[in-house]
Amino acid sequence: MKMETTNIAKNDTLKKVIDTYCKMKDSGVLQEVNNWDEYTGSMLNSEVAGVINGCWIMGTMQTAEDQSGKWAITNIPKLTNVKGATNYSNIGGSSWAISGNCGNVELAEDFLASTFAGSTELYDNILSCGAIATWTPAGDSDAYAVPNEFFSGDAVFEKIVDYSTKVPSIITGPYFHEARDAISVATTNITNGADLEKELKKAEDTVNFNMGQ
């Protein structure tokens, strides 16, 4: 979505994504689960050989101490013959915003600029709590270069920040989650045998309805 318009029903790239997803599922390469417990269990119980997710999933993975040295961090596969496709993406994370009701916007801006957008020391201190920054200067910190024993001594935090500099920027818009949910429903139906074109048209109609169009 961009500028509150939908691009679902005739989105050829999205169709390739869903087609690839279906092929992975049908071949057995992709394991589907029904809930979060099954998802984390598939990692902790050695049921899967890899996981495509944001860096925040590392905390869950490292609770399985018996798997230390068996996991690694790398980039992701990309679609071929798709303009702009890369081996880098993101999912989740947090955002900082200043409310329109803020009593001192200038002070709030200065605070954010001096801390989360200006202090590598802050990120060094909170790294041990599992808070990983994708703020580029943080990647130059000595703390981010420390080897991680669970991941075979790899400096995974430094690697993640480097990856983050290569993630394409997108404009999600205020109806991003509505679009995501509609496409998720469509994808589930398609993997179960529903017609791709009809499901994507239905998803687009759903989002347009939510946007009042």
Describe the residue ranges of each PLM region:
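Short, hydrophobic secondary-structure boundary micro-motifs
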Residues: 1-7, 31-34, 123-126, 198-200
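Conserved C-terminal helix/tail region of periplasmic/extracytoplasmic solute-binding proteins
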Residues: 23-26, 142, 159-213
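Alpha-to-beta junction loops
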Residues: 45-54, 69
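Non-transmembrane alpha-helical segments in soluble domains
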Residues: 18-25, 40, 44, 99, ...
